[in-house]
Swiss-Prot record:
Family listed: Belongs to the R-transferase family. Bpt subfamily.
Keyword Transferase attributed: yes
Record-level GO cellular component terms: cytoplasm
Name the record gives this protein: Aspartate/glutamate leucyltransferase
Compartment(s) where it occurs, according to its Swiss-Prot or TrEMBL record: Cytoplasm
Record-linked PANTHER family: ARGININE-TRNA-PROTEIN TRANSFERASE 1, ARGINYL-TRNA--PROTEIN TRANSFERASE 1
Gene name, Swiss-Prot/TrEMBL: bpt
Keyword annotations of the record: Acyltransferase, Cytoplasm, Transferase
Amino acid sequence: MQHRPQLFYTTAPAPCPYLPDRTERKVLTELAGPDAVALHNRLSQAGFRRSHAIAYAPVCVGCRACTPMRIPAATFAPTRTQKKIRSRHTDLVVNIIPPVPTDEQFRLFEMYQAVRHPDGDMAHMCWRDYAELIANTPVETFLAEFRRPDGTLVCVSLMDRLSDGLSAVYTFYDVNDLTASWGTFSILWLIEETARLGLEHLYLGYYVPGSPKMAYKAAFGPPEVFRDGQWSLLAALSPA
């Protein structure tokens, strides 16, 4: 049986969403067919990310700032502040469910985008776009819904299961309570869930030195980053 070659494409240059006065380009490929899960695993371990049925990675000319990052669950050491955030939400009910979009999730998503990313592309997403973000996946994907004891939905994390870990695809949350630190809490929970499942790493996407949007990721240590074809501790990362 002949296998068709895996095709990769390069996008046209576009404004960088993370650093001013820079241009981004991506290489992408479709995740489809019986080998989609295996391909997703290999590409994730090589620094790619998933959106819908597409795996992508930055290939920007003259810039290597976007650095794939993952957290080794076994050696993760929460800071004192992170421990306080975790203990603050011990009453939350967490439900892990299939990637099925709901109106309740979408309302939370819209409020999150309007406050946190009003100028981003996702701020203009309609219900159909949101449903595609959640449900269009060729791999093993789940949602974690975080609810208060009264049932109020406060945070949602979309995650993929890989052969060696979990991949945090997208998280959104209640922006009305700034003291809750839902973003930090969700990452702490995902690290714990990675360990609970007996997996090694939580893949966090791209760390971008100099980008305020991505600075929070360096707080979860000790993280590993992927550069020059290998994973190494962030402390060994040279400037981009």
